[in-house]
UniProtKB/Swiss-Prot annotation:
<dbReference type="GO" id="GO:0005737">
    <property type="term" value="C:cytoplasm"/>
</dbReference>
<dbReference type="Pfam" id="PF02580">
    <property type="entry name" value="Tyr_Deacylase"/>
</dbReference>
<protein>
    <recommendedName>
        <fullName>D-aminoacyl-tRNA deacylase</fullName>
        <ecNumber>3.1.1.96</ecNumber>
    </recommendedName>
</protein>
<dbReference type="GO" id="GO:0106026">
    <property type="term" value="F:Gly-tRNA(Ala) deacylase activity"/>
</dbReference>
<feature type="short sequence motif" description="Gly-cisPro motif, important for rejection of L-amino acids">
    <location>
        <begin position="137"/>
        <end position="138"/>
    </location>
</feature>
<comment type="function">
    <text>An aminoacyl-tRNA editing enzyme that deacylates mischarged D-aminoacyl-tRNAs. Also deacylates mischarged glycyl-tRNA(Ala), protecting cells against glycine mischarging by AlaRS. Acts via tRNA-based rather than protein-based catalysis; rejects L-amino acids rather than detecting D-amino acids in the active site. By recycling D-aminoacyl-tRNA to D-amino acids and free tRNA molecules, this enzyme counteracts the toxicity associated with the formation of D-aminoacyl-tRNA entities in vivo and helps enforce protein L-homochirality.</text>
</comment>
<dbReference type="GO" id="GO:0043908">
    <property type="term" value="F:Ser(Gly)-tRNA(Ala) hydrolase activity"/>
</dbReference>
<comment type="similarity">
    <text>Belongs to the DTD family.</text>
</comment>
<keyword id="KW-0694">RNA-binding</keyword>
<dbReference type="GO" id="GO:0000049">
    <property type="term" value="F:tRNA binding"/>
</dbReference>
<keyword id="KW-0820">tRNA-binding</keyword>
<dbReference type="GO" id="GO:0019478">
    <property type="term" value="P:D-amino acid catabolic process"/>
</dbReference>
<keyword id="KW-0378">Hydrolase</keyword>
<dbReference type="InterPro" id="IPR003732">
    <property type="entry name" value="Daa-tRNA_deacyls_DTD"/>
</dbReference>
<dbReference type="GO" id="GO:0051500">
    <property type="term" value="F:D-tyrosyl-tRNA(Tyr) deacylase activity"/>
</dbReference>
<comment type="subunit">
    <text>Homodimer.</text>
</comment>
<dbReference type="InterPro" id="IPR023509">
    <property type="entry name" value="DTD-like_sf"/>
</dbReference>
Length: 149
């Protein structure tokens, strides 16, 4: 699984002109599921996201996690994180999971975050979404359960 994690002051997802998910201070997490991913990848990613120490402590150092600051998480599915742009000008998405598997593991990831006690909002899987956010920092991190980066 791949994720782009952004520290935000606020974020929301709009589908068909309706807000379907919104958070205040916290993390916006774009998640892509690969064709070879399993529940172990979900578990690794949920543990990593919930434990990332990217919020500032009283001394201004990045030393606190989303759990420590009581922040919220907005999770948005994004299969394009598996777009391969190495050849030609059109991305190939052959490494992305098929929709059924992608949805199953996306929902599992959300469930694991909720079980950790986090307030989680989400977009709508496979919908065309408009994502609005106010970055904090900005702080943006790339995660890959295959540890490619």
């Amino acid at each position: 699984m791949r994720a782009v994690v952004q520290r935000v002051n606020e974020a929301k997802v709009i589908v068909d002109e309706k807000v379907v998910g919104a958070i205040g201070k916290g993390l916006l997490v774009f998640v892509g599921v690969g064709k070879d991913d399993t529940e172990k990848d979900c578990e690794w990613l949920a543990e990593k996201v919930s434990g990332l120490r990217i919020f500032e402590d009283e001394e201004g150092k990045m030393n606190l996690s989303i759990m420590d600051v009581g922040g919220e998480v907005l999770v948005v599915s994004q299969f394009t994180l598996y777009g391969d742009c190495r050849r030609g000008k059109r991305p190939s998405f052959t490494e992305a999971a098929p929709p059924e598997k992608g949805k199953e593991l996306y929902e599992k990831f959300v469930d694991l975050l909720e079980k950790k006690g986090l307030k989680v909002e989400k977009g709508i899987f496979r919908a065309h979404m408009h994502v609005h956010l106010v970055n904090d920092g900005p702080v943006t991190l790339l995660l890959d359960s295959s540890r490619l980066f």
